């Protein structure tokens, strides 16, 4: 049996939107490929080969998204008392006062460029956050090295 993929509601919706965009791209890539095949005298044409490769990449992305979505289990919003999958966590460095906001998500949703930063529950940082409560101080491995953070707030 295929393993379930836990997603937040927003993550599920974002992946559905990506799937729709990829399907639109596939239609366009198919149209371009057909036009190239009809106009090409030489089937070894590099433009034709590039179009075939692009179509294959899009199809692979669609397959991947469909697989993830078919196994998706949408998470219920948490109580906000304990950090779990889907929780948005406000952290503060007790020494500098620097604040950091992260959301603990499944690997399928992880994206450090999002705001708040989406951290995989399978990552070292994600694993370290799980189960903590407001007021807890924990040591996290960050790009700046090991740092102490205090949990200031937990949402969802």
From Swiss-Prot:
PROSITE patterns membership: GREAB_2
Effect recorded for residue 77 to C: Strong inhibitory activity and insensitivity to pH
InterPro entries: GreA/GreB_C_sf (IPR036953), TF_GreA/GreB_CS (IPR018151), Tscrpt_elong_fac_GreA/B_C (IPR001437), Tscrpt_elong_fac_GreA/B_fam (IPR023459), Tscrpt_elong_fac_GreA/B_N (IPR022691), Tscrpt_elong_fac_GreA/B_N_sf (IPR036805)
Family membership noted in the UniProt record: Belongs to the GreA/GreB family.
Gene name of the encoded protein: gfh1
Mutagenesis or variant effect for residue 135 to C: Lacks inhibitory activity and is insensitive to pH
Organism taxonomic ancestry: Bacteria, Thermotogati, Deinococcota, Deinococci, Thermales
Functional summary from the UniProt entry: Inhibits all catalytic activities of RNA polymerase (RNAP) by partially occluding its substrate-binding site and preventing NTP binding.
GO molecular function: DNA binding; RNA polymerase binding
Gene Ontology terms describing biological process: DNA-templated transcription elongation; regulation of DNA-templated transcription elongation
Domain notes: Inhibitory activity is regulated via a pH-induced conformational change of the structure. At pH above 7, Gfh1 is in an inactive flipped orientation that prevents binding to RNAP. At lower pH, Gfh1 switches to an active orientation, which enables binding to RNAP and inhibitory activity.
Descriptive protein name: Transcription inhibitor protein Gfh1
Keyword list, A-Z: Coiled coil, Transcription, Transcription regulation
Stored Gene3D superfamilies: Transcription elongation factor, GreA/GreB, C-terminal domain, Transcription elongation factor, GreA/GreB, N-terminal domain
Subunit and interaction comment: Interacts with RNAP.
Coiled coil regions in record: 1-74
PANTHER family from the UniProt entry: TRANSCRIPTION ELONGATION FACTOR GREA (PTHR30437:SF4)
Pfam families xrefs: GreA_GreB, GreA_GreB_N
Keyword DNA-binding: no
């Amino acid at each position: 049996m295929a393993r379930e993929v836990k997603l937040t509601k927003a993550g599920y919706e974002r992946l559905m939107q990506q799937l729709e965009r990829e399907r639109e791209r596939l239609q366009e890539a198919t149209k371009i490929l057909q036009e190239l095949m009809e106009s090409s005298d030489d089937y070894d044409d590099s433009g034709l080969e590039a179009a075939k490769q692009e179509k294959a990449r899009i199809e692979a992305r669609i397959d991947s998204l469909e697989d993830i979505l078919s196994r998706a289990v949408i998470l219920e919003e948490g109580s906000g008392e304990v950090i779990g999958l889907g929780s948005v966590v406000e952290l503060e460095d007790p020494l500098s006062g620097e604040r950091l906001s992260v959301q603990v998500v499944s690997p399928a949703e992880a994206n450090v460029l999002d705001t708040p930063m989406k951290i995989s529950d399978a990552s070292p940082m994600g694993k370290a956050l799980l189960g903590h409560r407001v007021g807890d101080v924990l040591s996290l491995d960050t790009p700046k090295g090991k740092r102490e953070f205090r949990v200031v707030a937990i949402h969802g």
